[in-house]
UniProtKB/Swiss-Prot annotation:
Required for ribosome biogenesis. Part of a complex which catalyzes pseudouridylation of rRNA. This involves the isomerization of uridine such that the ribose is subsequently attached to C5, instead of the normal N1. Pseudouridine ('psi') residues may serve to stabilize the conformation of rRNAs. One of its GO terms (cellular component) is sno(s)RNA-containing ribonucleoprotein complex. This is H/ACA ribonucleoprotein complex subunit 2-like protein. It holds the Pfam family Ribosomal_L7Ae. The gene is nhp2.
Amino acid sequence: MTKVKKEECEEVPETPSKSYDELLSYLNPVAKPLAGRKLTKKLYKCVKKAIKQKNIRRGVKEVQKFINKGEKGIVVMAGDTLPIEVYCHIPVMCEDRGIPYSYVPSKSDLGAAAGSKRPTCVILIKPHEDYQEAYDECLEDVQALPLPY
């Protein structure tokens, strides 16, 4: 075994991130209400701000546990999660407790916004005074989305 010099190694090009329209082709039939392009961007920014304050719940088990305990916030779910049975009960729980929820197109982008290398399918953003303005803006926009009846 020999060492390979740096000059000889080919650089692996970064995979370009897919556009919003490309991500829409991978959606589940359950992913409604889906956040638009601008709202998706706002939600990702709000998640990034919430991560800095450690004011976030990540993952199906953790989000489900804290929704049952009565914690309030905005639930953001990835629309490309398969199988659907993993998280199809979360919207019903949110509606029963009056918690606004929305879907975004990509679980890998949601995980990246949460500062994780792993994809994340459900996130609960809790309110905090440091990013209250961004949170209120997202809350207003998510509540304005039509419910899928």
